[in-house]
Amino acid sequence: MSVSNDLIWQVIRDNNRFLVKRPEFGGIQFNREPVNVSGKNAQRFSGLCNDKAVGVQANSPRGVVLITKTNPKNAQKPAKLFRKDVIANASSRKTYKSIAGRIGRTGYRDDLVKVSVARASAILSSQRPKKTVA
């Protein structure tokens, strides 16, 4: 017996392990899930209630790691639940094209392509060496 994604979201939206509430900023809620590409606490981005979810994280020296959820049959096997693809030391445009290809053109989650590319862009710009004033 499976439970619908909408019902799961109704249960976890106000209380889960990854939720970060900021009452001093008007009650805004963020999310620290590894497969939440935007960091917003919204059903569209949540990896807990969607069968297909995308995450973009920094790779240690340079580059990004693209995390996607695999088949929902692996829900009881945490080691097989996520697929991690390392996109390392490529130019920015190649990285963006690779992310767009793996998420959008394959039909995985077309709605998360722009958000994923923006997240990768922010990560890559933070990894660039800082310019020094001579």
From Swiss-Prot:
Annotated keywords: Cytoplasm, Phosphoprotein, Ribonucleoprotein, Ribosomal protein
Keyword flag Ribonucleoprotein: yes
Gene: rpl44
Coiled coil: none
Role description: Component of the ribosome, a large ribonucleoprotein complex responsible for the synthesis of proteins in the cell. The small ribosomal subunit (SSU) binds messenger RNAs (mRNAs) and translates the encoded message by selecting cognate aminoacyl-transfer RNA (tRNA) molecules. The large subunit (LSU) contains the ribosomal catalytic site termed the peptidyl transferase center (PTC), which catalyzes the formation of peptide bonds, thereby polymerizing the amino acids delivered by tRNAs into a polypeptide chain.
Assembly behavior: Component of the large ribosomal subunit (LSU). Mature yeast ribosomes consist of a small (40S) and a large (60S) subunit. The 40S small subunit contains 1 molecule of ribosomal RNA (18S rRNA) and at least 33 different proteins. The large 60S subunit contains 3 rRNA molecules (25S, 5.8S and 5S rRNA) and at least 46 different proteins.
One function term, GO molecular function aspect: structural constituent of ribosome
Subcellular location: Cytoplasm
Gene Ontology cellular component terms for the protein in this record: cytosol; cytosolic large ribosomal subunit
One annotated GO biological process: cytoplasmic translation
Protein's name according to its UniProt entry: Large ribosomal subunit protein eL28
Family classification: Belongs to the eukaryotic ribosomal protein eL28 family.
Sites of Phosphoserine modification: S60
